[in-house]
């Protein structure tokens, strides 16, 4: 099997660290690994498959000889450095927002639109975490009955703000447990522990946030549905890891709850957990504590939308997924594996 020179840009962050684990778990054919990060991390070492790999400072020259680059840096760094990797012959799979809506860049969820990889020009974008988690279980239902409208509420964990967000929540919870004053928030707009923050991202048109618009804009591109209508509310919740979403879908054609459950049970990347009569809550419905450090999106609470006058055309469900894994690192490594086929 061919071996590839793989680089991770942003290798020391939460997503970059998870990408490294995913490369190993998915037995990716890595011949040589390059870990790229800021100057302050350069020189440190990280173990990969029994060997110590030194972290290098990220710069254009660091991409020389790379076959595949996994991007886990912020938008500004991605815009500055990843085109340099493409110039040097690498194919880039980028997790930032920088290139997602560029019409020349495929935006890919392998379970949905893997064929879009074929028209890449050196760059492939990884969608937003909430987009991936919501669309993976939506897709098999769309294939069944043709989705035309989505109403979504997201409950997004601290992990969405990376390692600093998780550390901040943990520090706040510890302070609460000791009865101490909560440290001043840095990663979030307000204290997250024992609280909900109904804003993720900057405010865009008509009062929606940038995070809320991503699901519509990215969903249209990924599912090839330019007329898809999405009304989304995104809320940061005091959960360490794994996002949850309540999703109501309106379809072109009639669909029964039984058909929806069967489609979800058979769908790649989805685990159906939907037995409200089960004794154990973990068997009744998905919860973020169960999906943390898992690659599958768990879906459950499947029921018809009783608010829709066309009741046979509406389904509501609940899903949970690990933001760092399938919402970011796992999806990127899955794309990279497709490049090797």
Locate predicted features.
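N-terminal Rossmann-like NAD(P) cofactor-binding subdomain of oxidoreductases
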Residues: 1-192, 227-229, 262, 290-291, ...
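Generic solvent-exposed, charged/amphipathic alpha-helical segments
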Residues: 20, 216-220, 261, 265
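Glycine-rich beta-alpha junction loops
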Residues: 39-41, 129-130, 154-161, 196-203, ...
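Helix-loop-beta segment of a Rossmann-like dinucleotide-binding subdomain
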Residues: 120-125, 195-206, 317-319
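A glycine-rich, Thr/Ser-enriched phosphate-binding loop motif common to dinucleotide/cofactor-binding enzymes
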Residues: 124-135, 207-216, 327-331
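Oxyanion-binding "anion nests"
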Residues: 193-240
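C-terminal active-site/capping subdomain that shapes the small-molecule cofactor and substrate pocket
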Residues: 228-341
